[in-house]
């Protein structure tokens, strides 16, 4: 089984480019063989296929309403899924995916942690988030949140 770090967001929108920037940072690092790092981009529900057999999943995404500017926050899948207030549409994003996850996976959902950031992240914050994602992906704990 492999752990996965899935960085999501829109690299062309500064309010949503946290995940892609962390992905770029991780791509320049030495990653253990049992950790997959994916640029989830705006993959939406297509990302469900990466949750089927992962030992652990760490999502990295921009968030809103959770923390102060330039702060990193750790959230559980349930905390993010609870932000889904409507059905599926163009802006449903990660909350909808995590809300739907338990209902559509053939196997039990993997442990999921979301590394979130609000606002435009500094280079230092992006680097810290990349290191945190790697640490969370390789630890044995059931859930960091």
List PLM regions with ranges:
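N-terminal catalytic or cofactor-binding beta/alpha core of small enzyme domains
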Residues: 1-145
């Amino acid at each position: 089984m492999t752990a996965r770090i899935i960085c999501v967001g829109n690299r062309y929108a500064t309010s949503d480019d946290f995940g892609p920037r962390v992905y770029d940072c991780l791509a320049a690092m030495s990653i253990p063989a049992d950790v997959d790092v994916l640029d989830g981009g705006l993959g939406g529900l297509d990302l469900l296929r990466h949750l089927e057999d992962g030992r652990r999943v760490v999502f990295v995404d921009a968030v809103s309403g959770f923390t102060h500017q330039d702060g990193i926050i750790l959230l559980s899948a349930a905390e993010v899924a609870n932000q889904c207030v409507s059905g599926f549409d163009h802006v449903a994003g990660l909350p909808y995916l995590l809300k739907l996850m338990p209902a559509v996976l053939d196997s039990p959902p993997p442990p999921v942690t979301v590394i979130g950031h609000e606002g435009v992240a500094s280079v230092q914050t992006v680097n810290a988030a990349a290191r945190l994602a790697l640490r969370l992906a390789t630890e044995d704990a059931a859930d960091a949140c």
